């Protein structure tokens, strides 16, 4: 008798994706983050669903409904803080996942890579709209400032901003539509994730060495399922510690003040996972220039395959490229710190230099160093 997982039409799909999936025998823990992102997405959808049951998307009651969830709903505080800090864990996993893709040359699997960039855009949009929903000071002013960036688009900019707002300022209509989009986008992200996996399983996973591994593959279960489970436990413990001991560590104190259109906070800044983009945006004194730089922080990832000049896929055997990669990581961490600082000397100057370095490394130095390494290896 044939095993049900190999004969049943639905089980067969699950079997080929998660059980008998041929996987390179040498992939490291850096490959855990894809499955961790899946777990984070499920966690966000479940906690978000429970929050939506108690949240009211009206500017007069939104702030107090969040307070009601934390005070009066059974374990409401746990659900709310798991959702808020779960977003932070999501972005940590997301950035590590993208970083691993750059380090090991996974961007050469173009369909999977481009679908991943679409997913990154979608997750960023979802997180931004979710940050607006508590209707605190930083929610309101963050929404006002970020949506206002679209006014930099020539001719249609102002009309576009008013169309998104549903009026002449961020108001009731804005909150209602942001809630609607924030609710539906995670399900769209889930569908896009399935397509992302579909493209990945067409080509098979990359591996640290960057060479073809078709001759040396092992089944995903139990070898990697147990490894992924360890990753789940590790992230779950960190998230639980954050939620139970320091739930507001990554939040902004201004968001505990109800939104007031007549009182601007001294320093408007987004959540920590957008700070490096925020730093790049404000390092250019021109509005349109800043918006273009902001957009290109992600668009630059799309052209990564075109910038690949090395004869090797992975950076595993390329020490000079490795050095550049870790300088890029340090640069992004510096930009994150700069984004949290006020707009004054020396932070503006440091921000301008680090923004320039970010684009220089990816667009100029990485391709040049790769060509040098080819010469050194006489390729």
UniProtKB/Swiss-Prot annotation:
Pfam families: Cytochrom_B_C, Cytochrome_B. Heme b b566 binds at residues 97, 196. GO terms for molecular function: metal ion binding; ubiquinol-cytochrome-c reductase activity. Its cofactor is heme b. GO terms for cellular component: mitochondrial inner membrane; respiratory chain complex III. It is found in: Mitochondrion inner membrane. GO terms for biological process: mitochondrial electron transport, ubiquinol to cytochrome c. It comes from the Eukaryota. It is a multi-pass membrane protein. Keywords: Electron transport, Heme, Iron, Membrane, Metal-binding, Mitochondrion, Mitochondrion inner membrane, Respiratory chain, Transmembrane, Transmembrane helix, Transport, Ubiquinone. Coiled coil: none annotated. Heme b b562 binds at residues 83, 182. Component of the ubiquinol-cytochrome c reductase complex (complex III or cytochrome b-c1 complex) that is part of the mitochondrial respiratory chain. The b-c1 complex mediates electron transfer from ubiquinol to cytochrome c. Contributes to the generation of a proton gradient across the mitochondrial membrane that is then used for ATP synthesis. This is Cytochrome b. It comes from Cryptomys hottentotus choma (Choma mole rat). The lineage of its organism: Eukaryota, Metazoa, Chordata, Craniata, Vertebrata.
